[in-house]
Amino acid sequence: IASGAQAPGISRLLLDDQSLDSGWVGVRICNTPLRTIVSQGCRPIGDPMVITQAERNIIQQLGGRRAFDILSELFQTLPTREQRIFQSGLQIGRVINEYQDSFQYGDFLIRNITGVDKGLGSISIGDYVRPGQTIQFHIRDHESASAEFSQLVKTGAADSIPKAALLFTCNGRGLNL
């Protein structure tokens, strides 16, 4: 499947040594173990925090304080370069497995921040949350995406040498990844 084109004929389909601008190309994988890796392209900023008040997809409090206040304070502590990334690539990572002592790449399910309400001090995200869950703010940039992808590939290659790969990308992870 080739998607994302603005008009028919723009996507390129590859079949053996041919490059096509229409039609379809299929891949059949049989009797081969598959391993999926996902580079979310985000790196954590600040510290992990526990949601203390939330309703549906709206985080009202983190650690007993207004979520927006914590977000504003975090912004002030960042270097200028990271503040620029923060303004266009801020995400929230929700911990997948709470039963760990510390968290690292792959331990978070990354979600978009869909809005903030400065008056109420709340943050809305693209997922339902509940009190007691651990979150951490993340920023998305191409350097993080590339580093995380390289680490995941190295970890996977230690088990066996890959014979092939399928790569799916998006602009949020960086145009050059």
Cite the ranges covered by each PLM segment:
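Small-residue-enriched flexible segments
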Residues: 1-176
